[in-house]
C-alpha cells in the first residue's frame, strides 16, 4: 500500500532526540482521495480569487464535482475580496451556497476573514486546493505562523502577465494548524481530469438538481435535451443558477465525447 499525505501510521523510533523513525504500518483509512492524493480528509477548501486571476468557474465546478464524487464536503473560499463589489460577491455566494457549499470571502493580503477560516478548519483535516496565483500560499502562511518549524515556508507567487499564477507549492504537505486541526496544502492546478463518472450519473453530483429528481416527464431524464425537464424549467425560472447548469452540460458533453475514444 502506498503512503499518502494524511495517513495515520505506526512508526519504529530510531533516533528519539532527532525525531527520526521508520514507518512500519499504515493504519486503516476512513477515505482516500484520488486528487489531491490524500487520506483521512474531513473536507476540502478550494480557493479562487474573485479577480486577478479571473476565476475559471468551469474548473471550480469540476473540483466541486470531484469532491462530491468522493463524498467530501467542499468549502468555496474567494480571496482578494477587496477587488469585487458587494453585488458581485452576493451573486457568487448565492450561486455556490445553492449547490451545497459554504462560501467565504477573504483577503489574505489584508488579513480579512481569517478568523472565519479558522472556525471552518477547527477540529478537522482539510485539503487546501486551488489554481496558482490565487493567494493560497499567502493564506497558508497566515494560518500557520510556525510553518518554518514544521517544514518549508510556502513561497508566494505573483500573477504572470497573462493573468495566470505561477506555481509555488511543489508537492502536497500536511501541517498542524492547532489542536486536532490540520491542513493539507497541495500544488496549484490549471486543469482537472474528470472523475470516472458515467454521463447518466453526472446529475446526481450536482446537488441543486436533487430536489427536482422524479419531477421530469421522463424517468432517467439527464436534464440536457429532453422535453418536460424539471431541471431546465428551474433554470428558466431562476431557481437553479444558469452558469452552474451550463457547467453541467459542458461536463456532460466532455464525458460523452471522452467515452467515444
What are these language model-derived features?
Residues 48-57:
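Short, glycine-rich nucleotide/cofactor-binding loops
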Residues 53, 136, 191:
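Short glycine-rich, flexible loops that bind phosphorylated cofactors or substrates
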Residues 58-68:
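Histidine-anchored nucleotide/phosphate-binding helix
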